[in-house]
From Swiss-Prot:
Optimum pH is 7.8. Monomer. This is Vinorine synthase. Changing residue 243 to A: 83% reduction of activity.
Length: 421
């Protein structure tokens, strides 16, 4: 049972300085236009800082003031999105919700079997089809929840229409640094995305249509499990330098293929799609603080007859990453078209949030106990995150409920509902 929560207040946080007239209209890029209309949900859980004298009211006020300051630099986030074309940077403000949770932090996060219970720590729904209406024109919303023990949860919804996860990391790093009182922060660049990928008039905005009967599980691959997978892959190949993400994706892909073959038979190729950051792949490279959806989709595939173990899948994954394409707009368009044409059971897509430093986000009262997302309503769309120790991988995997039950025990044994570890 989810902890009882009481909403205390909601207000709009405005930038501390008005946005100049010259910056009132922010044109989104063509890559932004091709992205789904939804939000990136992200939650940070913090234990009670033993050396802090701040009460909830002071903490909330401190967060609001620092958010107001940082919004001066991230001014589109305080505006309102015009349908698939631009952001009206009118300083309408960021919704900021404050709530009280009638539970200890440890009680709330030690046994989260149903991951949708995490949704209550978000300011609003991240995806359409839920019980709460999605505010599609609001770029950013924030919620802080105070537990009885003094712990906190900070939930953020950032519109995927104007930002990718690296943009989220850039914003959160700037906000936490400002909250700590630092005067030098990494300033965002909102010009580069549209300059390199100019918007195209009348581009339709893809809608996210939730799948039915989808269940999501959080699989935790700790250091020991990663080591075992690496040893198995090394024994089957002369290559030894496998990344954590490659090992986990190949391992999951192999079992998804097995489930698909058992349920549907082998008809077409099995495809994996990975979202890849373009900033470092551009010529010249773009800085990491360039805001927007500066990413593309890369594909790897094996024939329907493929029937080997997971190390054999690492090669196709690596080969797809080595591909280069000058026309990234065309590359992404081709990828989006392919996504719509494939049958869901033939496809595994994944995004990696690893190595983005989310466990270093310190508002001034210490690092988080847990950094997580929440459920996603599309089957076979995996999200990978670092474990708190930094040497493991969390795989958040949504599947059709009956297909999830068909996964082998060796994979299902990695399901972990304890977010306090």
């Amino acid at each position: 049972m989810a902890p009882q929560m009481e909403k205390v207040s909601e207000e709009l946080i405005l930038p501390s300085s008005p946005t100049p007239q010259s910056l009132k209209c922010y044109k989104i890029s063509h890559l932004d236009q091709l992205l789904l209309t939804c939000h990136i949900p992200f939650i940070l859980f913090y234990p009670n800082p033993l050396d802090s004298n701040l009460d909830p009211a002071q903490t909330s006020q401190h967060l609001k003031q620092s958010l107001s300051k940082v919004l001066t630099h991230f001014y589109p986030l305080a505006g309102r999105i015009n349908v698939n074309s631009s952001v009206d940077c009118n300083d309408s403000g960021v919704p900021f919700v404050e709530a009280r949770v009638q539970a200890q932090l440890s009680q709330a996060i030690q046994n989260v079997v149903e991951l949708e219970k995490l949704d209550q720590y978000l300011p609003s729904a991240a995806y359409p089809g839920g019980k709460i209406e999605v505010n599609e024109d609001v770029p950013l919303a924030v919620k802080i929840s105070f537990f009885e023990c003094g712990g906190t949860a900070i939930g953020v919804n950032l519109s995927h229409k104007i930002a990718d996860v690296l943009s989220l990391a850039t914003f959160l790093n700037a906000w936490t640094a400002t909250c700590r009182g630092e005067t030098e922060i990494v300033l965002p660049n909102f010009d580069l995305a549209a300059r390199h990928f100019p918007p195209v008039d009348n581009t339709p905005s893809p809608e996210l249509v939730p799948d039915e009967n989808v269940v999501m599980k959080r699989f935790v691959f700790d250091k020991e499990k990663i080591g075992a997978l690496r040893a198995q892959a090394s024994s089957a190949s002369e290559e030894k330098n496998f990344s954590r993400v490659q090992l986990v994706v190949a391992y999951i892909w192999k079992h998804v293929i097995d489930v698909t073959r058992a349920k549907y038979g082998a008809k077409n190729k099995f495809v994996v799609v990975q979202a890849v950051n373009l900033r470092s792949r551009m010529n010249p490279p773009l800085p990491h603080y360039a805001m927007g959806n500066i990413a593309t989709l890369l594909f790897a595939a094996v024939d329907a007859e493929w029937d080997k173990d997971f190390p054999d899948l690492i090669g196709p994954l690596r080969t797809s990453l080595e591909k280069t394409e000058d026309d990234h707009n065309h590359e992404l368009l081709k990828g989006m078209t392919c996504l719509y044409e494939l049958e869901p059971q033939e496809l595994l897509s994944f995004t990696s949030w690893c190595r983005l430093g989310f466990y270093d986000l310190d508002f001034g009262w210490g690092k988080p106990l847990s950094a997580c997302t929440t459920t996603f309503p599309k089957r076979n769309a995996a999200l990978l995150m670092d474990t708190r120790s930094g040497d493991g991988v969390e795989a958040w995997l949504p599947m059709a409920e009956d297909e999830m039950a068909m996964l082998p025990v060796e994979l299902l044994s990695l399901v972990d509902s304890d977010f306090s570890k």
